Amino acid sequence: LYYFVVKALNADIDEKYRKAKKIQFLCGIFTVAIALTIHTWVATMAWFATYLGPRIGAEAALAAVTTYQDAMLPAILPLYLPMLLLFGIHFVMLLIGKTRYPRGMLAFHPVMWNLLLAAVPDIAQAMQVPVATWMSVMSQSSTNSAIMVWCIAAAVYEKKHAAHLAG
């Protein structure tokens, strides 16, 4: 699915901008590989917490895993740069009219939805609304959800556009 999204986003950019397309595509491929690696690492940390909990106590296991994750975070954060470029280049190209979509599609762009979905729990907390599990899930799945919103919007646009061209 991720590779399909990388190719689809890249295909949206006008052919005249080969350098931007190439950078965006390479960042996309790197993002797919790194995302799989990071998600596997996070799952491994969850497994360690589950495994260690009964053996050394839940609090000690959580402290050990959290300390390790905190120590690794500075090494992991730069790996998100290609993902920012993958979506950022597409966002800018859409904003300046260099894709096949009208600017109105910005309302469905992964950057917009990712920011919205990731911000909802923070906004709720600022409004002193009790944070619920669904808010955490929304925040943690924001990129995947944002990609799905874009794919649906792009499919609807393409269907309407094709019907309009057909007559």
Residue ranges and their predicted role:
Residues L1-A166:
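Hydrophobic, aromatic-enriched alpha-helical segments typical of multi-pass transmembrane helices
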